[in-house]
Amino acid sequence: MGNNNDWLNFEHLAEEKQIDAVKPPSMYKVILNNDDYTPMEFVIDVLQKFFSYDIERATQLMLTVHYQGKAICGVFTAEVAETKVVHVNRYARENEHPLLCTLEKA
């Protein structure tokens, strides 16, 4: 039996099979949209409860929603963004507010 150490050499495996680079997941912006009925205090509550913003940042974002018509609450993977949208919209309806949370690709 000869001294054949080819089985220890793994370089040929890399040449035979191209390893695909792992792509980062698609990201989505979660957006709060303005309406004429949802109280500003409720929007602040939503931003604190679902996005963990402190009162100052939540107030800034609420004012952006109010004056610019919408604000980005955060950028998340698809699953996280979808879950946040569902939870925010459900919470708004449970509290009888028309606040609309949407998502769009980042």
From Swiss-Prot:
<comment type="subunit">
    <text>Binds to the N-terminal domain of the chaperone ClpA.</text>
</comment>
<dbReference type="InterPro" id="IPR022935">
    <property type="entry name" value="ClpS"/>
</dbReference>
<dbReference type="GO" id="GO:0030163">
    <property type="term" value="P:protein catabolic process"/>
</dbReference>
<dbReference type="InterPro" id="IPR014719">
    <property type="entry name" value="Ribosomal_bL12_C/ClpS-like"/>
</dbReference>
<comment type="function">
    <text>Involved in the modulation of the specificity of the ClpAP-mediated ATP-dependent protein degradation.</text>
</comment>
<dbReference type="GO" id="GO:0006508">
    <property type="term" value="P:proteolysis"/>
</dbReference>
<dbReference type="Pfam" id="PF02617">
    <property type="entry name" value="ClpS"/>
</dbReference>
<comment type="similarity">
    <text>Belongs to the ClpS family.</text>
</comment>
<protein>
    <recommendedName>
        <fullName>ATP-dependent Clp protease adapter protein ClpS</fullName>
    </recommendedName>
</protein>
<dbReference type="InterPro" id="IPR003769">
    <property type="entry name" value="ClpS_core"/>
</dbReference>
